[in-house]
UniProtKB/Swiss-Prot annotation:
Key word NADP present: no
Gene (UniProt): rplO
PANTHER family assigned: 50S RIBOSOMAL PROTEIN L15 (PTHR12934), LARGE RIBOSOMAL SUBUNIT PROTEIN UL15M (PTHR12934:SF11)
Biased composition (Gly residues): 21-37
Organism lineage string: Bacteria, Pseudomonadati, Pseudomonadota, Alphaproteobacteria, Hyphomicrobiales
This protein's UniProt keywords: Ribonucleoprotein, Ribosomal protein, RNA-binding, rRNA-binding
Protein name: Large ribosomal subunit protein uL15
Subunit description: Part of the 50S ribosomal subunit.
Signal peptide range: none
Amino acid sequence: MKLSEIADNAGSRKKRMRVGRGIGSGKGKTAGRGGKGQTARSGVRIKGFEGGQMPLHRRLPKRGFNNIFRLDFAEINLDRLQEAIDAKAVDAGAVINAEVLVAAGVVRRAKDGVRLLGRGELKSKLTIEVYGASKPAIAAVEKAGGTVKILAPVKDEGEAA
């Protein structure tokens, strides 16, 4: 076989149909778009229209709402914090808060605050100031001899959690 003998299989490449090029082509005049109207125009489609049938987005019930008071936290686990301490990115002797974690690159941005979660093991004695922390995370920090200061306002017993 020579390089000049290489060719595509028969029928593997089909030429595109040039529409709107006279009635003899079979795709002249309306170019396969039917008659006049909205769907014959370019760039126009009726989004969600199902031919008169009730569209799916109207058949399904509305549900839920967006809470405008919702807080979005940057979450950090104990193992990630320990990795940063081992890599000397975070000083274990200093107070660890959101600004320190962002500066060290442990969290990208503080968002509405940092929440400490309990995955992993902590070996260092730390003083941590975070907006919130899970019970296992607090227990692990205190077991290692450290303290956790929660910056979030404390909810009363009467308030819903």
